Amino acid sequence: MKIHLLSGFLGSGKTTAIQNACGELTKKGNKAGVITNDQGIRLVDGDLFEHLNIPNRQVMNGCFCCNYNDLDNSIQSLIETNKPDVIFAESVGSCTDIVATVIKPLLKFRPETQVTFSTFADVRLLKMLLQKKSSFDESVRYIYFKQLEEAEIVVISKIDLIDANSLEEMKQLIDKRYSDKIRLYQNSFDTANIRQWLTVLDNQPVTNPSSLPIDYEIYGEGEAKLAWHDQQLEIQSMSYNAAQATNGLIKTISQKIHFNEYPIGHLKFLLNGEKKISLTYTPQQELFDTIADKKNNSAGLLINARVQTSPETLSHIVSEAIKETEIKFNCKILVKSHASFQPGYPKPAYRITD
């Protein structure tokens, strides 16, 4: 069995790639399982994989490295229950030091398993960081570039969202900076690109990659700069405009964060357990996939927001957006669950160096 481990910063496109790769594998008669990972306890991506009937497990309340035993138990559970040919394991986007804390323990404790390692990077954010135009804190940037430094395979994602000239310039920079790595330029909605990535993974030889020196003080500081906000809402409307209100709430949250110039890791929303909307850190946001044309009197919305600010500030922004939406759309928004926090200091269960 193979485990395809994915790293990469928040909003880098890991989940989309996994979702479409699972679809391609299923067409070929292969069984795939997924393990998602987050610092919180309710994850948009986990709910989405459930809706798509893709066998999955979730490692919550911390990264793979700090919850390695939970990761191992999740692998075993998928093997016993679903017997997958391939497992995709997606590490939380604020995590690095994957080789020493996840890959080497996997190779030690599961020597029969083949492990590949891909790190994803949104081409637009990478361009901003290389040009020093991003407002992410230096400690957050440290995590970002360590993720790329330790990768075997670098997947430059979302290339469809950048113009051809800029992409060519980025290719020249990336090919020079990461010449020692396999480099893929990918639109994960493009079937040919997904098939190319899967081919690279299939042909990747078994290796024992080298661990990186990691300054855990900077690493911990970087994680602590990011606020996590998870919230489950129910939107109720006697005017049958719950969909419009939900769309308005999503836009208001995004606009308030951008107005305050807080760098966004990602904003993920899941409507009624099945429709996902993702927004990231770039000034030119992707177009909203509008949901405002549906007429219904209630809607469920799960929010996962990861933003460089304090948990209190992020929680206040969402609360104000809820109040404004209730007034504007004459609706009632009920909070079913809510958690705002900063990730704790990284304390890996294992750290195997060379």
Task: Show the residue positions of the predicted features.
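P-loop NTP-binding site
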Residues: 1-6, 11-12, 16-17, 203-354
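Short acidic, S/G/P-rich loop/turn micro-motifs used as interaction or catalytic elements
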Residues: 94-95, 126-127, 161-162, 239-241, ...
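Canonical P-loop GTPase G-domain recognition
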Residues: 141, 145-223
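Nucleotide-state-sensitive switch-loop elements of NTP-binding domains
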Residues: 2-7, 12-142
